[in-house]
């Protein structure tokens, strides 16, 4: 259950002194993407922030811990997917290499009808994700432990998602091999990237095609109230990924398809 102190739109905390952090950073940022944030959703984001900071003291979840920066660089940035693709209706979404839950948990908060699966290779991060899911009262979302190379071979997950997203730091060729096998034919793979992705797209052209994908669009935006340029690459799934992909653990990174 979310603590009642989070019912207020303005949240106070003590660090070197009394500091008031206005959640307008969140609501204004999401509004720039055409997203309205309810009081209940604001409450959930604040509880998420508290858990993130609490767990970050004992494990490495994020280097970004300041309230305003988390609201903008993690929460608002995660929600930008709504700027690139339609998220209405009951779609199944997989977040590969989710880490502390970005973008999957913010997307679930904003789009509660989404069925979300969070995938991470570190079990202790999965324990954190399960704590967040429970404390925020989220349903229709699960966190699983495993490597994408292994989980993508399982019938339950392979080719079963309408949307696959990732904010993981990896070149697009490698990331495509990790993610495209999960996408159903007709679905989308949307990686979050910093700055321009033109060169990455060019270098990943063969990999995307081999894996059954097709480049559709590039959605560029500046994170509201910052000078941070972000890009969402929209890649469609036009045919099934050959069974030999993804290759064994580590290969997509060590020897990207080129």
Language-model regions: role of each:
Residues 1-17, 243-252, 256-258:
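Basic Arg/Gly/Lys-rich low-complexity intrinsically disordered segments
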Residues 2-90, 94, 124-127, 131-141:
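Class I SAM-dependent transferase core
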Residues 79-170, 176:
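Conserved SAM/SAH cofactor-binding pocket of Class I
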Residues 111, 183-185:
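Helix-to-beta-strand junctions that scaffold the AdoMet/dcAdoMet cofactor pocket
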Residues 125-127, 197, 201:
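Short alpha-helix immediately C-terminal to the canonical SAM-binding loop
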Residues 186-196:
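Conserved beta-strand signature within the Rossmann-like core of class I S-adenosyl-L-methionine
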Residues 202-258:
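SAM/dcSAM-binding transferase cores
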